[in-house]
Amino acid sequence: MQTHEINQRFTEHFRKAGHTVVPSASLILDDPTLLFVNAGMVQFKPYFLGDAPAPYPRATSIQKCVRTGDIDEVGKTTRHNTFFQMAGNFSFGDYFKEGAMEHAWGLLTSSQADGGYGFDPERLWVTVFEKDEEAAALWQKVTGIPAERIQVRDAKDNYWDMGVPGPGGPCSEIYYDRGPKYGREGGPVVDEDRYIEIWNLVFMQDIRGELPPKEGHPPIGELPTKNIDTGMGVERVACLLQGVENVYETDLVRPVIAKAEELSGRSYGANHEDDVRFRVIADHARSGVMLVGDGVTPGNEARGYVLRRLLRRIIRSTRLLGVHEPVLGEFAAVVRDAMAPSYPELVTEFDRIDSVMRNEEDAFLSTLTAGSKIFDLAVADTKKAGGTQLAGAKAFQLHDTYGFPIDLTLEMASEQGLSVDEHGFRELMSEQRRRAKEDAKSRKSGHGDLSTYRTLLDQHGTTEFLGYTDLQAQSRVLGLLVDGVPAKSAAAGTEVELILDRTPFYAEGGGQIADTGRLTGPGVEVEVHDVQRAVPGLFVHRAKVTAGELGVDTSLEAAVDSKRRHAIERSHSATHLVHAAVRSAYGKRAAQAGSLNSPGRMRFDFTAPAAVSGAVLGGVEEEVNSYLQNDVEVQSYTTTMDRAMELGAVALFGEKYGDQVRVVDMGDYSRELCGGTHVGRIGQLGVVKLVADSSVGSGVHRVEALVGMDAMRHISKEHLLVSRLAEQFKVPAEELPERIAGVVSRLRSAEKELEQLRVAQVLQSAGELAGKGTDVHGVTLVAEQVPDGVDGGALRALAGEVRGRLGSRPAVVALFSADGDKVSFVVGVNTPAQDLGLKAGKLVPSFAAEVGGRGGGKPDMAQGGGSNPAGITAAIAALRTGLDQAVARG
């Protein structure tokens, strides 16, 4: 049975049982506790926690999941995977234990002709929590399973909670007996290789309390409504129904291995080392495609770093299989074809996915070869010195110069029997490894922990947001935190966090920064400087009491800084229009990857399918400003997600949407799902002026623009600058480009003449340098440091002149010049030396690391640079050694 059919049978079984079929959530959700979605219940957490009412009593989903805690183990065995699918059914105060058992057992044991999976019930076992006697009795009642195939386990195995105070409950697992071939008799408590878990049923019935960590979180009561959360491992069921040993042989994964076999000419199963590489490719290709599909782009922080690490492990594994051409696009296409029946969006988004992955591959391949040579030399030096640990400085160089993630260096070193000085690496990376975005997010989340905010939400309910229509409102203080601790009052000068019953203040979200403003009441004044949604539905106002004493239950007049808010709204509306214009220019492949809307200025990141040209961006600016002339009304309304999609509304990758969504329309030109605030008519934007564009990551481009009066002031400054230049050059403004081009041309000619004079002066030393040659196994080597400040062009000319003066004898010329903290070097090899197999480009890696650099070139001439002038003497010695070895090898 194919995996897609397994999924179809699952959702159809539960649909017939009255469950709402909910699509898989994005792998990226707005949950600060999770890097990626790693379980089916994650998108339903607000309902289980009571943060929001469940919109349906029963639900079912096939959730895509990524777990990256054991990336290094992937491939070494067949057990580990980073991507998997979790099929689940969920009850929110509806059916409980008995119903969950009936649904699971029915699907597993019904015949395939009747829509089930057709498992032999005699080969199914179950486990229950040791204190859950009710579950053991119900299993026998519901299924008729004999008592000897029901095993009890302690809380470690069969009790679920979130690790913090909140809901919890016993769980019950269903296992399949694969037979004597796989291990000992006696059920899952004896052998979990033979008895494989396929389904876990969690019975959420308890409230877990707060105690010191070592004592856990014991039950302190029962939940008012009992819930069900189950998860069936799709890949495990696929293995059993397809009669294969592990996930790598199933219909969704084996095709990727087959493609790797085709590209490499090697066979899976021939030897362990290659099998590890095949499995790394197969697993990481699936994770990579699904993560990029959900809007993750390779980077150096958080999710982007994990994705980059996955993709670069694929690239290295393919090279170890002997494939040196770009391959990520090939693997991505195989994953798309295999997964599309369950995730059709992979087809519509494939051009973007393919572009992001290929761009990352191109970027890494450009440095992988050079970096690998540096690594090999470092390994050789370490072993030669009798060491067992690669220096932290070398790991840092590989990361900083060649883009090697530390994990890749650790893995490569381990393959060579070496460890890495991680402490030294971390010290060198201390500044670069500060994750600015995460730090900013943690600063904004306030002082209290999440349980404090959840308690406030439970006590007072969600905050009523009035800011779509009102910038002033009467509000009441429901809660007050000082240094994260609930307080009754706060004196002047105190930084506080406020919970209001209703607020006109917008909480940061969707790229729009938070409102600021004032709260005033009898004898008290408060300055609001930030607003965050600490937990869904709860607005936390970060503020400072500037006068009087603030207390809980105080009534206040809340007033948003209206001038600032309107400037932010202009920026946010401009972002929507720029997004529409970018999609008009590049198509749907240009998906939003991030935005920031602040007063008078907007920033928009998008995935670029190709290089972004200035001409296209100029067209984007013109199209936006042209549309502003229509002054259409901006409309917002709430509708169902399905209806919004029918209307063509653009949903953003990584965002979590409910059944009801807010749509912002700007005529037929722009229609997006958005919870932010906007202008009433687009004419209020005035003008949008693009002021910067740049690349901010693999396949991600950023444009920045000024809006309204900020844009007008910028244009006025530019006009004044042009006027002054025209006056200076004594030409009309329209002739400035031609006049400036002429001046630049004359300047370049003068610089060229000056360079020729410098070269002529440098060449005077050629005869002296040629006389300093030494013999290395019949090859004349001239390796010298010339005066400081000689640039690469002059060095090349000098090396060529010296090489020519050495006649027909095999010769190698290497010249170095320092300039401050930089080093330039050139290596020249004459034809007789090339006939001996010597090549300039091949000699560079033998010494470049000593000057902290790299280089390359052709057989006759190579050049490069570095950042360690103090290493020139060592570099010359290393070159001599490298030449000695190269000549000896012949």
UniProtKB/Swiss-Prot annotation:
EC code(s) of this entry: 6.1.1.7
Disulfide bonds: none
Sample GO molecular function, one term: ATP binding
EC category: ligase
Intracellular or extracellular location(s): Cytoplasm
Superkingdom of origin: Bacteria
Alphabetic keyword roster: Aminoacyl-tRNA synthetase, ATP-binding, Cytoplasm, Ligase, Metal-binding, Nucleotide-binding, Protein biosynthesis, RNA-binding, tRNA-binding, Zinc
Catalytic reaction annotation: tRNA(Ala) + L-alanine + ATP = L-alanyl-tRNA(Ala) + AMP + diphosphate
A biological-process GO annotation: alanyl-tRNA aminoacylation
Cofactor dependence: Zn(2+)
Domain notes: Consists of three domains; the N-terminal catalytic domain, the editing domain and the C-terminal C-Ala domain. The editing domain removes incorrectly charged amino acids, while the C-Ala domain, along with tRNA(Ala), serves as a bridge to cooperatively bring together the editing and aminoacylation centers thus stimulating deacylation of misacylated tRNAs.
UniProt-recorded name of the protein: Alanine--tRNA ligase
